[in-house]
Design a protein with these regions (language model features):
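TRNA-recognition modules of translation machinery and tRNA-sensing kinases, especially anticodon-binding
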Residues: 1-272
Length: 272
């Protein structure tokens, strides 16, 4: 076989320098993998699928009714302030939460039981090391006869132990949301101090108290059930809404900057 000039040169170099072998195969580039956010979304979906929840995707561009009015949020509520909400028109927004899926799911199913997990992008006019103008949330909704707070506690504990680890527990702390009554903030025991609030006699630098805030939850407000076409005298339910980025950072002990999750730093992203 006749060799090209370049091939002859490579072979000549090989003879002159025994440490150089042009016939050795090159290094194969590493394979890619799911981004940490995509991984987290997949994990959340599978955890709730085990409980019978069905994954839904509802609009990111939403009307005022599904975004606010139908969820018991009046026109003068601070959450409606255009300093936080992206208004495209007077009655059309980039939804700031995944709770818009509640009414849409009620209208779609019509007759309970309803078990929905709505995972999607949300938008708010905020930007800092702990907040981003675009982030992901997941909204859970369960409606049936005789649903009560103990069912909510069971679901939150199941999620916490499935995602964060079997030793983690949750607690409900009274709060206020327009679309749930009663309403709670869900806290999860801190993994760093094992829920004690202290390490070597000093306050835990992560939680300071033994607990970390997971997100909001509560029993669906009767008026919201009515707005969705569900009889509140016959059915009850609970809902919860938590951040994908937040739980990912909590699981992987990322305490510095939310924006790192959307960086192009391969060394950082390849850890997950």
């Amino acid at each position: 076989k006749k060799l090209s000039l370049s091939e002859k040169k490579l072979l000549q170099n090989k003879k002159e320098d025994s440490s150089f072998d042009p016939t050795i195969p090159g290094i194969t580039p590493p394979e890619g993998h799911y981004h940490i956010i995509s991984q987290t979304i997949e994990e959340v979906e599978q955890i709730f699928k085990a409980l019978g929840f069905i994954r839904r995707r509802y609009p990111e561009v939403e009307t005022d009714w599904y975004y606010a009015e139908g969820l018991n949020i009046p026109k003068d509520h601070p959450a409606r302030d255009d300093q936080e909400t992206f208004y495209l028109k007077d009655d059309v927004v980039l939804t700031a939460h995944t709770s818009n899926g509640q009414l849409r799911e009620m209208e779609k199913i019509k007759t309970p039981p309803i078990k929905m997990i709505n995972i999607g992008k949300t938008y708010r006019r905020q930007a800092s090391y702990t907040h981003a103008p675009m982030f992901h949330q997941f909204e859970g909704l369960l409606i049936d006869q005789d649903i009560n707070i103990t069912h909510l506690i069971g679901v939150t504990n199941f999620f916490a132990q499935s995602y964060f680890g079997p030793e983690r527990i949750t607690r409900l702390r009274p709060h206020h949301f327009q679309f749930t009554e009663p309403s709670f903030e869900v806290d999860i025991s801190c993994n760093h101090c094992k829920g004690t609030g202290t390490i070597n006699g000093k306050p835990c630098r992560i939680c300071k108290s033994g607990w970390l805030e997971l997100g909001g939850a509560g029993m669906v407000h009767p008026q919201v059930l009515k707005n969705g076409g569900i009889d509140p005298n016959k059915y009850s339910g609970f809902a919860f809404g938590w951040g994908i980025e937040r739980i990912a950072m909590m699981k992987h002990n990322l305490t510095n900057n939310l924006r790192d999750l959307y960086s192009t730093d391969i060394n950082f992203l390849s850890q997950f």
